[in-house]
Amino acid sequence: MNNSHNKIIMLGTGSAGVTRCYNTCFFLKTADTSLLVDAGGGNGIMSQIEKASINLTDIHHMFITHAHTDHILGAVWVVRMIMHRILGGEYKGNLNVYGNDKVINTLKQICLMTLHKNYNALFGSRIMLCEKLSGDEFQAGDISMQCFDVLSDKEKQFGFRAIMPGGATLVCMGDEPCNRANFPIARGADWLMCEAFCLYKDRDVFKPYEKFHSTAMDAGAVAAELGVKNLLLYHTEDKTLATRRTEYAREAAQSFKGNIFVPDDLEAIDID
């Protein structure tokens, strides 16, 4: 395989209440696999997938970190539209959805209560809901995954460590600060994806700590301690988009001397 196919495609980069960008979600894409991680808070996910030039018929794996609205409600739309294509004979194979018990139960209940019975009949045959426990290892296409509990006090949430074709390692911390108990699984990763709700200098405006979030400065300090090579910041406020890339990177760089990425919606980043 040509490893240059390995990419992160950020469909959205914002936190829950944003209106000027989409909620944080992304693809991990290889030559053979399009793994969707979270789906934002509504059917805007369909537009983002289309703009990213990804076909729904190529999506066979979805990982949902937790059951908050800005992460799971878009997944209902992805499942619905894939169900529609299955029934129309346009979609080959299965859709595998991975998540903890709360995620899987929530997604299925919303679908059962809102979708046509012909769609819901596909659960267990073509739509496979794969409940995972913390520490479970599994394959999402050609991406090797290990999920872990981020130990949130707010909502049961899983992050993951992924090994891409070619061996690059990527750790996604979900949308909460990295708990020190999870430092071993993230240490030395090639890529760390970490939330940064706002700048530390703007903490009194956006109040990240009251919302169980962190700042760009905090994320940089964690990345430095973990010895990762690349830090990607996401799940931000949307009031400073014009300066976000420069200012967030500058603040994180106070501690972290590796590569820092602060992507916009629909930006693709090579991860080889």
Stretch-by-stretch model annotation:
Residues 2-52, 156-175, 191:
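Conserved beta-strand hairpin/beta-sheet module of binuclear metal-dependent hydrolase folds
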Residues 8, 38, 49, 66, ...:
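Divalent metal-coordination and catalytic microenvironments
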Residues 18-20, 129-201:
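Active-site-proximal loop/helix segment associated with metal-binding centers of metalloenzymes
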Residues 36-40, 59-67, 100, 170-176, ...:
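Active-site neighborhood of phospho(di)ester-bond hydrolases with catalytic His/Asp-centered motifs
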Residues 43-96:
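Active-site metal-binding motif and surrounding structural segment of the metallo-beta-lactamase
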Residues 69, 97, 103-104, 236-241:
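Short histidine/acidic/glycine/proline-rich micro-motifs that form metal-
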Residues 91-156, 261, 265:
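Metallo-beta-lactamase
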Residues 177-267:
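Cap/insert and terminal regions of metallo-dependent hydrolase folds
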